[in-house]
Amino acid sequence: MMFHPFHLVEKSPWPITSSISALSLTLGFVSYFQNLSMYLILLAVLMITISSFQWWRDISREGSFQGFHTHWVLNGLKMGMILFILSEVFFFVSFFWAFFHSSLSPNIEIGSQWPPKGIYPFNPFEIPLLNSTILISSGITVTWSHHAIMNKNYISALNSLLITILLGVAFTMFQGFEYFQAQFKISDGIFGSTFFMTTGFHGLHVLIGSIFLLVSYFRIKNQLISSDHFFGFEASAWYWHFVDVVWLFLFTFMYWW
C-alpha cells in the first residue's frame, strides 16, 4: 500500500533500448555520410519504433488502468514536458545561431554574399509557402480537437485530430519532394549544412509529432481519454504548436529573408 501520491515506476527496459537505438541512429547517419550502408539507420529506426510503442503502451496502462497518474504525478509530467520543449528551443537556437553567424557577415570564402555564390535557394512562395499553410492549418485543427475533448465531443475530437495527422503527413511528403528538387546539397558549404540540418531536424520533429498525435488518436478512439484526464493529448498538442512556431521562424529567415 502506498502512503504518498507519487508513482514509483517499475524497472523498464525501454529507456536503455531507446538510448541504444538513438546512438545507433547517429552512428548510422555518420556511416551513411561516409558512403557506407544504410542498414544501421533502418535497424535503428525499427528499434526506436518498437521501444516507443512499448513505452507508450506501458505509460497508457499506468495512467488509464492502474490509476498511477495522480494530480501530483500529472504536475510532474507537465513540468517535464515543459522542460523538454524548452531544451528543444535551445537546440534550435543553436542552429539559428550558426545560420545568422554566417549570413549576417558572410566572409570572402563564400563570395561575401548570402546565399553564397553558386547557391540557388528555393522559391519561398512555392512549396515552403504551401507547407506554411499546411502547418498553420494543422495548428487550428489540433486546437479544435483540444476544445472538442474539453466539451466531451469525442467524435469531433477524433475527426479534427485525424485531419491534423493527415496534414502532418502531407507536410512531410512535400518536404521530401522539396529536398529531391534541391539544387544544392548538405555538403555545399555553410548554407547547405545549416539549411538541411535545421529543416531536416524540424522535419524529424514533425514526424515524431505526427506519431505522438496518432497515439492520442487511438487513445481517444479506445475511450482512454476523458474531458478531465487528457494530459497525453495535451502534451502532444503542446509539442505540435512548438513545431508550428519553429517552422514560422524557418520560413521567415531560411526561405524568405
From Swiss-Prot:
Protein name (database record): Cytochrome c oxidase subunit 3
TM region(s), chain numbering: 13-33, 36-56, 80-100, 154-174, 195-215, 237-257
Gene Ontology CC terms, in alphabetical order: mitochondrial inner membrane
Source organism of this protein record: Rhipicephalus sanguineus
One GO process term, biological-process aspect: mitochondrial electron transport, cytochrome c to oxygen
Keywords: Membrane, Mitochondrion, Mitochondrion inner membrane, Translocase, Transmembrane, Transmembrane helix
EC number in record: 7.1.1.9
Alphabetical list of InterPro entries matching this protein: Cyt_c/ubiquinol_Oxase_su3 (IPR024791), Cyt_c_oxase_su3_dom (IPR033945), Cyt_c_oxidase-like_su3 (IPR000298), Cyt_c_oxidase_su3-like_sf (IPR035973), Cyt_c_oxidase_su3_a-hlx (IPR013833)
GO molecular function: cytochrome-c oxidase activity
Gene3D superfamilies membership: 1.10.287.70, Cytochrome c oxidase, subunit III, four-helix bundle (1.20.120.80)
UniProt cross-references to SUPFAM superfamilies, sorted A to Z: Cytochrome c oxidase subunit III-like
Reaction(s) catalysed (UniProt annotation): 4 Fe(II)-[cytochrome c] + O2 + 8 H(+)(in) = 4 Fe(III)-[cytochrome c] + 2 H2O + 4 H(+)(out)
Membrane topology classification: Multi-pass membrane protein
Role, per record: Component of the cytochrome c oxidase, the last enzyme in the mitochondrial electron transport chain which drives oxidative phosphorylation. The respiratory chain contains 3 multisubunit complexes succinate dehydrogenase (complex II, CII), ubiquinol-cytochrome c oxidoreductase (cytochrome b-c1 complex, complex III, CIII) and cytochrome c oxidase (complex IV, CIV), that cooperate to transfer electrons derived from NADH and succinate to molecular oxygen, creating an electrochemical gradient over the inner membrane that drives transmembrane transport and the ATP synthase.
Subunit structure: Component of the cytochrome c oxidase (complex IV, CIV), a multisubunit enzyme composed of a catalytic core of 3 subunits and several supernumerary subunits. The complex exists as a monomer or a dimer and forms supercomplexes (SCs) in the inner mitochondrial membrane with ubiquinol-cytochrome c oxidoreductase (cytochrome b-c1 complex, complex III, CIII).
Coiled coil: none
Protein location: Mitochondrion inner membrane
Protein family per UniProt: Belongs to the cytochrome c oxidase subunit 3 family.
Disulphide bonds in the chain: none
Chief place where the protein resides: mitochondrion
Keyword Translocase (UniProt): yes
